[in-house]
């Protein structure tokens, strides 16, 4: 599932595809203090840089700037993030959040539920959304 090749084969540029949930968690400021670096997303759908491979459909969804920091998330979300949350890559954060809350993994993990609830409230506050 994961590729060890994190460089574009044509231009040689190191390329770290973005992970929607990782950026979302980072933006919610949930990970201000104790952080752990999430494994780099090296899934084949976006191994190559968009400048050399503009026709790759996966690259069209990568709209975040090159300077955006690497993804960070609480340690107990790391494995789950990659196994479950990296798939709705083209979908917006609200649907990603819904899938997280509806997942069996979240349902059986009280600590994960607490983190997700805090994150959801923080994001809603930032976006001005009320539940």
UniProtKB/Swiss-Prot annotation:
Which superkingdom does the taxonomy of this entry point to?
A: Eukaryota
Q: Provide the induction entry.
A: Induced by interferon alpha.
Please state what the protein is called.
Torsin-1A-interacting protein 2, isoform IFRG15
> Which species is this record about?
Homo sapiens (Human)
Gene behind the chain: TOR1AIP2
